[in-house]
Amino acid sequence: MEITVIASSSIDEGIGSWDLKTGTEQLQFKPCASPAHGLTAVGEKFLASSQLSARNTSGSIFYWSWTKPQAEVKSYPVEPIKALAANNEGTYLVGGGISGDIYLWEVATGKLLKKWHGHYRSVTCLVFSGDDSLLVSGSQDGSIRVWSLIRLFDDFQRQQGNTLYEHNFNEHTMSVTDIVIDYGGCNAVIISSSEDRTCKVWSLSRGKLLKNIIFPSVINALALDPGGCVFYAGARDSKIYIGAINATSEYGTQVLGSVSEKGKAITCLAYCADGNLLISGSEDGVVCVWDPKSLRHVRTLIHAKGSRKGPVNNIQIVRKTIVANSNKTQVSWKSRGALIPPPLEKYERPVEDTMDGIVTVDPPPFSDVPVYSSFLSADLIDEQVKELQQQGSAATEMEMERLKLEYKRSLQMNEQWQKNYENLLQVVMEEEQIGGTN
């Protein structure tokens, strides 16, 4: 399996890429001047990065295919986007604006499915849970919020004036710099870092603070060890600290050790589980590969050459065997001969304009896969059906019938969930009324 490291900078140094095993430099993608957390490999099928002007007055989102160095698709949202994230399958792309608004696009069509006000100040980081059912956002205002994708698309909740988020964490006193989620499913924990020099461990299921870990310096970046016992914290004092997740005391310093990069501030981290390697980026434009067990330096990758070295502010690990794969969400743009999907729409379409914009969820029957695992809009399913109709083979006819049934079942499930929400809300309101009379 070929594993590639990609890295970007806040100045226009482009996106560098290297073979992780050999350190060989690969294709460089230009132009790119991305903010922190503004680079993502969408389903590991193509690259996307938000772009900011020097004064943050305008912004854009660029797409690159893996085979061409120049950006092929450019989108211009209504406001500058900082943080950018995609779910595992590459179905959705989510952007966090400087206003605190969050935008959710369907990748295959470019449609803006949902826009909502997430925070009081700019969104600094976004991350999906392992099963893609939850989105976690961090902000310059110090808050962290957990969003359920199903709840976001429940218009009944919005009409009732209910909060859209599942959890709201406000214990950080300064801007949130990074967020990671472990792989524990319903027992997962969230780890956040902030300019207040702390990392906090939160319970995702209980919605409460578990640990508060104080560090000697501001933590810019986080990475999780796959074992789930420790995490790595990249600091502004050029050190990478090792923090304990399962600390014995509720509060207090739980720093197990550190390794020094002997350079400038650590700005980003990534962990490659396939090779058990830790990758760091720093302000001096250097990408370092570490052995986390021995804490020894393995190799150095230079992002920018010459006198004009910009800080490395984003690192991603991409598995090239996955890049070559395709899934059903790619049908609509690949059928048009494009390597990557169309530009992102600026505005959310009014519901009354088309009922095809309804997002439906397809829970596989008798499957262990969570019901949140597959999200497709109805018009995207329609488009797939039309494309299959044009192909005309017996196999595609069978696939077309399957998609029709999937479409119908999704609409029925959407109606059932709507009724369940209404019934549950009615029960809660009745209980509150009974409690008030007592």
Swiss-Prot record:
GO biological process, one term: negative regulation of shoot apical meristem development
Keyword Coiled coil: yes
Family annotation (Gene3D superfamilies): YVTN repeat-like/Quinoprotein amine dehydrogenase
InterPro entries assigned to the protein according to its UniProt record, in alphabetical order: G-protein_beta_WD-40_rep, WD40/YVTN_repeat-like_dom_sf, WD40_repeat_dom_sf, WD40_rpt, WDR18/Ipi3/RID3
Pfam families linked to this entry: WD40 (PF00400)
Keywords assigned: Coiled coil, Repeat, WD repeat
GO annotation, cellular component aspect: Cul4-RING E3 ubiquitin ligase complex
Coiled-coil stretches noted in the UniProt entry, renumbered to this chain: 394-434
The WD repeat ranges on this chain: 36-74, 76-115, 118-157, 171-212, 214-253, 261-300
The UniProt record lists the keyword Repeat: yes
Effect of A265V: In rid3; impaired in adventitious root formation and shoot regeneration at the restrictive temperature of 28 degrees Celsius
Described function: Involved in meristem development. Acts as a negative regulator of the CUC-STM pathway in shoot apical meristem (SAM) neo-formation.
Protein name per Swiss-Prot or TrEMBL: Protein ROOT INITIATION DEFECTIVE 3
